[in-house]
Amino acid sequence: MSEKEKSQLSELSTLGIKFYEEKLKPILEPEHIGEFIAIEPYLERYFIDENSTKVALKALAELPDRKFYFARIGYKYAY
């Protein structure tokens, strides 16, 4: 992975966390605790599912050319 790609992934993660903490956390917790979320922070789009594979497939079906930040709602780590 090139330095540019690493930088882009770092930016994606930073923006994904910021979007979740500032805008999504208050509206998603506690109703969706434990579910997985795929976030496209530049478009401020997100997808939720109880299954990590299904949430990835939903996100890619809607936005096939985008990259996503993945998390588990209400948890520090997805696994």
Regions found by a protein language model. Give the residues of each.
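Amphipathic, hydrophobic secondary-structure cores in small proteins
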Residues: I33-Y75
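Short N-terminal "domain-start" leader segments
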Residues: M1-E31
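Short, charged, surface-exposed hinge/linker loops at domain edges
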Residues: E5, L12, I73, A78-Y79
